[in-house]
Amino acid sequence: MTFKTVLENDKVRIMRARMDVDAREGLHTHAADTIVVHLSGGEIEDTANGKTVVNHWKPGDVEFEARGSSHSARNVGKPIDVVLVALK
C-alpha cells in the first residue's frame, strides 16, 4: 500500500493511499482514530480477532478505524484509492 501525506497539522494527518491488486498489509494496530473515505470501489479481505471477512466498497463509502484496533488486510479485487483522516 502506498501513502502520501497531503495535509498535517496539530489536529489531523490526511493521506491519500492506494492498495494495488493482491497487495497486503500485515497485522497492524491503528495509532489514531481514522476516517477512511473510499474514492474507488473494490474488495478487501480483512482479518481481525481471528475472523476473516471480505468487505465490498463503493466510491463514496466511509469507514471508521478506532485507535488501538488491530487487523490485517489484502486487496482481493481491483486497485483501491482512499483518503485517510487520522485524528490527533
Model features per residue range: what roles?
Residues M1-L7:
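Local beta-strand/beta-hairpin segments that build beta-sheet-rich folds
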Residues D10-R24:
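Extracytoplasmic/periplasm-facing segments of secreted or lipoprotein envelope proteins
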Residues E8, G50-G68:
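Short acidic-glycine-tyrosine-enriched beta hairpin
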Residues T29-E45:
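Short, conserved beta-strand element in jelly-roll/cupin
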Residues R24, E43, D61-V62:
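Residue-level marker of beta-strand positions
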Residues R67-K88:
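Ligand-binding loop in jelly-roll beta-barrel domains
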Residues E25-L27, E45-D46, S70-G77:
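Short beta-strand His + acidic residue motifs that chelate non-heme Fe in jelly-roll/DSBH
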